[in-house]
Amino acid sequence: VEIINAFTSSPESPPAGAVDILRAGLIPLLILKLKTESDEIQELILGTLSNCLRVEASEALASDVITILKEKLTHPSVTIRSKAAQVILEIGTHPEGKSTVCEEVIPLLVSLLEDADPEVQASAAGALMFATIKPKGRCLALRAEAIPRLLKLVAEENSKARLSAIKTLTMLAEVAEGRRKLLECTNTFQQCLRDPSEAVRRAAEIAIRVIQWKPF
């Protein structure tokens, strides 16, 4: 596993080694190893899966990866929780992955927005951002009370999750219920217009426009 992880830990996006692992059909074996290996090896496997699933996710989904990742999202290890959320983020970038993430892990991701570790928060917010692209994902996130947790991350100037949280809230504002709740909180987004990051400032501008949109 350490050799595989080194093979995929390249600065390329996606790493060249990830494609070779996919072609070799090793994804089901790596997923199976998550059940039995030590925490240290699990961290390596999750890092490898993250790189591989950036390329293609169908084999992992067929191997019931979501069930195992759900367990890892509540693991005592901060690194394992963060890496598991990152794998879910990569799965959510694929059309076939969004539905699975919506159906199975949104409540867990919402709870991780309050994790004590900033990396876990950032990975969870990123995964939610992709999961809420689908209407069903937005409804499930609203039902899981995602808005107050996301707003808290937006209000934290140094939060690593700030950009993903703003984008996720923009998705939730596409739903009438979400827009109503967020209309009372536009000041939080106004503060982001002074953020040093251009991406954050631009995302905040879009969020404010969507929240304040009114039908003719």
What is each stretch, according to the model?
Residues 16-19, 58, 96-99, 139:
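Recurring C-terminal helix/loop segment of individual leucine-rich repeat
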Residues 49, 66-69:
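Extended amphipathic alpha-helical scaffolding regions
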